[in-house]
Each structure stands twice: as C-alpha cells, then as structure tokens.
C-alpha cells in the first residue's frame, strides 16, 4: 500500500468533510420561509454527520502515523440562498467527496481491510446523501433523476 498516497487522500477527505460542516451550517442559517424548520434540521444533520466523517478520517490519518490537515476544502456558494441553489451545491459537494472515497478504495483495495471497509461504508453513506438531495431537487411526481446541470435524464 502506498501509505503517502493514502494519507494524502485521507487528508483531502478530512478537508472536504470539514468544508461540508461549514457549508451545511452556513446554509442552515440562511434558510427562510414556511418550510424552514425541516430543511434546517436536515442541514444540521448533514453538518453533524460531516463532522463525524471528518473525525474518523483524522483518526485514520493518525493511526497510520500521519498528521491531520487543518485546512478546509473549497466552499461552494452562489450567494443566492435559494433552496434549489443550496441543494444543487449540496449535490456537487456530495459528488466530489464520493469521487474521493472511490479513489481511496482504489488505493487500499486488497491491501488493508480496515481502510477498504471504511471507504466502502462512506461510499454508501455519501451515495445515500447524494440520492436524497437528488430526490429533493425533483418536482412532485417527477420520477426521473435530477442532474447537476439542472437537466433531466431522458
């Protein structure tokens, strides 16, 4: 196993998860309107889960003898604070971090069962998040998936 590459990827995951904590917390503060309470609760839950994911990534870094990053990944924001824009940004964030968990899995597959299972578990969790956001972006009775660019899959 290429330990340096694994540590680099785990630190990137840590940074992206921390960006998600900031992102979801910020947007929970910016939601207005009659649907505010359930949306804010969902955003708070996403922030809390992101923090748990970040902590676990940091633990793995230190277990492997590395130093956890203090950096925070890129923060996406349209500054419109429209629920649709917030959800599209969430979808982009989930897709980005999901890609990194797959890259981690490729780095450790067949070499470290603990890291392999960690990557698989987080792939499942992030896929569930991505699918939940996708459904939230659909219009009532819309069965087709929403795509990041705002186009429907035909």
Language-model features: locations:
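Iron-associated oxidoreductase/ferritin-like identity signal
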Residues: 1-154
